[in-house]
């Protein structure tokens, strides 16, 4: 018999290498085949519900790493809730309408003007559904559990029908109105945009300081006086109707030396402006308040038009001249000013951003960006240009086409936010936010939000269910809305485009505004944010196993102005409360340098590729490790580091499995009867479990990750599993000390496997398949609640004191290793010179301190006896590490002076010789081979 045959070496077929790209897919197929998600839902029937409502990603293109972070984060929470006493169904969804899909078809060669609207919409639907399948495959491959066979789609008939009812709630409350107002206009999309569809980029603009001659100065200013205006959009000057000044500002009438003109600018800006205009010598003729200028008129610099001077509180003196050129058709503030002074709302531009002849013959047919130069030339020709200079500033862009947009007055349908702002803000306060600053972010977005333009001049979307009478009166009564909703539920929204208005109205419908019984219908569609913002009705209220409001909405922080925002508004209108009880927001995924990922920069981390190379578990563990409350940097190097952490976790599972392979329920040892170190680790694990559950409950996965890695690396790998080898391998198979440790091992193995299932379901299911448990899948078990122990806190405190002592021993061992005094720790002996209280602590452990410190011999002495060469630490205590005396035992690998003391076992220490003699008596005669 060989020495190793006398050892209880752990055995398991659980592989060291996970081969994740291959095995994960097999496991996912097994889950699908066995309907594990459905089984979990059935198990949770009758339990309190927790509904995380999925914010629908846009159905266009394969999933990216931001998608992965979002969906995996949701999966953590849903799986955790499902395994801790909640019924937590998860219905994934997709946003399937909108301009990008139209663009994709145009790019593919389809011309929507050469086919019927329904034909084009059918192509859009086909494309959207194809994209849903592509993304669905990607999400499922990440291990995300949910109703993949029954997701929600904003193009679904029942969703569209519910959305029409939401629109009806706005109509019923009188919150909808039609107006010609400046809106964000995307010439590249040929449509109005909502605030949530706009992003800002820094651009360099041509700015102009220009003059307008006073025509009627109200006795305060003469006709040789010129008001100095400033604009960052010279192309809007042809549409100028007025000059805005601040009532409270002090304005200066300035006469530059050698000039026959006088100029008016804000007094606070005069110093800077004089420098800009090279007014080296000038006289301030007089100063006056802006309020005195109200009602004056000036001449347009190059068009035969009189301009009004009026008062506005949006005028500032932090840039420009303190006098603002005002074109009511090209800006929100300008529009409100125009309404106040009854000015024409003039925006002479077509849908493609091309100026019309109303601007003047020079501008007819000119793209607005090219019109800057024409306007500047005309200013110069009319001696009205004081200065042209470039300015870098933030400018709005269409978030989808990445092209600049304009403010342009067009006829649109709006939701009046002002009428319900107080209700909306009250609803904000009733929600819990993770992180807490989310409340302020959302509140500020809604506090300052303008009216919501909900009409879009596009084809692929849900039509505005508005009819028009013969005299132009809009019709959207409860009767017509409900009828359209019913039609959509039966036929889908294509019916709106297929039928005439009369065939979409209820049978026999009449209106006093249509004496001849003729009606027309609206051709615009709804903003897609109205689509997704209605999902609380289209999904939560539509499916009886979900709850409204949802327990949580979880999305990127951009959704404070997007989905969180639109959903809140629609929900308040429909039911008077928020659609969610809590909101969790996340940052964006960036590359390792903090840059946005883009194919052109070559810095994209493609989750589909990572899954094929490394496995979904690596992405999942990375998500757990990331501070998702802020922007998250990720690179292949990051994922490589995470794969190292994964390898340690996997090896831990493997060690626990191997060393419990011969352990069954009949071998169980109750906590009270366990050895001291096992009692400590039982309490310690439950303390860890309680902390992890608390962090999961608070959605603090980052700290949970830190605690997990710390527990696995330090408590298990560096300490307990190290100590365990001497017990599990060396002691008799059925000895109490070994079974005590195995009982603890198994509890940790079982608890850790269940606890990590929300995070690493592929791996924990693999581990579970090697455990002898009644449930076929670990997902169908419950995460255990942490146990409490009567002496638990005192025990942890005592062992914490010992761990402090042990850390000093380990430090000295490392120094001895570096000095080549020893190789392995078991080649060392340690002499501890301790205070009385420290000696008492060691004696009270009830365990061999040498074994716990990983040395072959440990002696305890009084602190006063410490020799000079001993390394001191707290309370005058000291440690002296030396090479252990004796020979290495072939069985336990300890260095002992009693090796060979039993003549039958010359290569074994006395302890091992005794154990072998008792358990393998045949070896006394046969002997042992190395």
Swiss-Prot record:
Per the Swiss-Prot or TrEMBL record, what residue ranges does the short sequence motif 'KMSKS' region cover? 596-600
Does Nucleotide-binding count among this protein's keywords? Answer: yes
Q: How is the cofactor bound?
A: Binds 1 zinc ion per subunit.
Residues bound to L-isoleucyl-5'-AMP: 555
Positions of ATP binding: 599
Q: Identify the cofactor(s).
A: Zn(2+)
Lineage top rank: taxon: Bacteria
Instruction: List residues binding Zn(2+).
Output: 889, 892, 909, 912
Annotated region described as Disordered, given as residue ranges: 1-21
Which catalysed reactions does the entry list for this protein? tRNA(Ile) + L-isoleucine + ATP = L-isoleucyl-tRNA(Ile) + AMP + diphosphate
Q: Where is this motif: 'HIGH' region?
A: 57-67
GO CC annotations?
cytosol
Pfam families given for it? Answer: Anticodon_1, tRNA-synt_1, zf-FPG_IleRS
**E.C. no:** 6.1.1.5
Gene Ontology terms for molecular function? aminoacyl-tRNA deacylase activity; ATP binding; isoleucine-tRNA ligase activity; tRNA binding; zinc ion binding
What are the entry keywords? Answer: Aminoacyl-tRNA synthetase, ATP-binding, Cytoplasm, Ligase, Metal-binding, Nucleotide-binding, Protein biosynthesis, Zinc
The entry's function note states:
Catalyzes the attachment of isoleucine to tRNA(Ile). As IleRS can inadvertently accommodate and process structurally similar amino acids such as valine, to avoid such errors it has two additional distinct tRNA(Ile)-dependent editing activities. One activity is designated as 'pretransfer' editing and involves the hydrolysis of activated Val-AMP. The other activity is designated 'posttransfer' editing and involves deacylation of mischarged Val-tRNA(Ile).
| Note on domains (UniProt) | IleRS has two distinct active sites: one for aminoacylation and one for editing. The misactivated valine is translocated from the active site to the editing site, which sterically excludes the correctly activated isoleucine. The single editing site contains two valyl binding pockets, one specific for each substrate (Val-AMP or Val-tRNA(Ile)).
Self-association or partners: how does it assemble? Monomer.
Protein name (Swiss-Prot/TrEMBL): Isoleucine--tRNA ligase
